[in-house]
Amino acid sequence: MKLSVISAVFVSLAAAAAAKTTPTREVAAAAAVPDPVQDGIAKNCKTYYQAKPGDSCQKIVNDYGVFTFGDFFKWNPAVGKNCESLLGGWYYCVGVPGTPSKCTEKHPTPTQPGSACKCGQWYKVKKGDNCQALEKKFKISDKDFRKLNGGLNKECSNLQADVNVCVKA
């Protein structure tokens, strides 16, 4: 009898201890890595895209509209700096934690990489345009223009002619 009481107490204590050490917070499971992928793909990738024949890195960046070419290259370094190793049929990372989902809003193409998904007004950049001129023309602050077009570098030297930028939220 003493042995069964002691056993019952021990089992109760063990169960209580286990309950106290069990985490109460759920951790999101990582996305299953599809096959095939190139070496060096981001370990924390949560969203993958299967490249089609004829795709380019810039096309993928433009189609998703929520990350820059720099992000794409960082997540998929094996594609090469000039995207020379992008392979149709292979999977590429198009989202890590914190990356918004693919833009589903209608927008003109091509768009400046990193442009806002939801945009109230688009403008097709002309040869000779620069950030300051567009900010003045559309009465938008530099801070807001860059927020709407997150892929622009500090010098704004990557603003491209014949590409659409967001000029109004």
Swiss-Prot record:
Disruption phenotype annotation: Lead to relative tolerance against H(2)O(2)-induced oxidative stress. Impaired fungal virulence in both injection and topical infection bioassays using the last instar larvae of the wax moth Galleria mellonella. Impairs fungal propagations and ability in suppressing immune responses in insects.
Taxonomy, superkingdom: Eukaryota
Segment forming the signal sequence: 1-19
InterPro entries: LysM1-like, LysM_dom, LysM_dom_sf
Induction section of the entry: Expressed during in vivo infection of insect hosts.
A Pfam family it matches: LysM
Gene3D superfamilies: LysM domain
LysM domain sequence ranges: 47-94, 121-167
Recorded domain comment: The LysM (lysin motif) domains are small globular domains involved in binding chitin in eukaryotes. Blys5 contains 2 LysM domains.
Family the UniProt entry places it in: Belongs to the secreted LysM effector family.
Functional description taken from the UniProt entry: Secreted effector that enables the plant pathogenic fungus to manipulate host defenses for successful infection. Required for the full virulence to infect insect hosts. Protects fungal hyphae against the hydrolytic activity of chitinase and plays an important role in evasion of insect immunities. Binds chitin and can additionally bind chitosan and cellulose. Coats and protects the cell walls of insect pathogens from host cell recognition and additionally shields fungal cells from the hydrolysis of insect chitinases.
Protein name per UniProt: Secreted LysM effector Blys5
Protein's gene: Blys5
